[in-house]
Amino acid sequence: MTKLSRKLQTQKRHRRLRRYLIGDATRPRLSVYRSNNHIYAQVIDDSAQTTICSASTVDKELKEKSEKLPSDCNSSSIVGKLLAKRAIKKGIKQVIFDRGGNLYHGRVKALADAAREAGLEF
């Protein structure tokens, strides 16, 4: 029996999670994608198949403040706060958190905690 690579394990977990995580207009899905260098988060209405708002470490607003954000928990918390601010501005207070198959630890946890502190409920 062969062992799956880390990427395949993440994809397998994500497929398993997506069976149950469905966002709608009243409670959209906060989806997180984590790469080696960056973290991306977006609030998605699955019923209309639209992205309501998004934020990432490569966002123009964050690049104006600093030249390059490192791939650490501090950057993830900045992205979480920015995403929560944008979602609340569009009238969204409750979301369903989709960790994207990643373990709820480190950068993903930092983003979630920052979004909660900024006012999102999940």
Curated annotation (Swiss-Prot):
Keyword field: Ribonucleoprotein, Ribosomal protein, RNA-binding, rRNA-binding
One GO MF term attached to the UniProt entry: structural constituent of ribosome
NCBIfam families the record matches: L18_bact (TIGR00060)
Pfam families hit by this protein: Ribosomal_L18p
Organismal lineage: Bacteria, Bacillati, Cyanobacteriota, Cyanophyceae, Synechococcales
Protein name as catalogued: Large ribosomal subunit protein uL18
The UniProt record lists the keyword Chaperone: no
Transit peptide recorded as keyword: no
A biological process from GO: translation
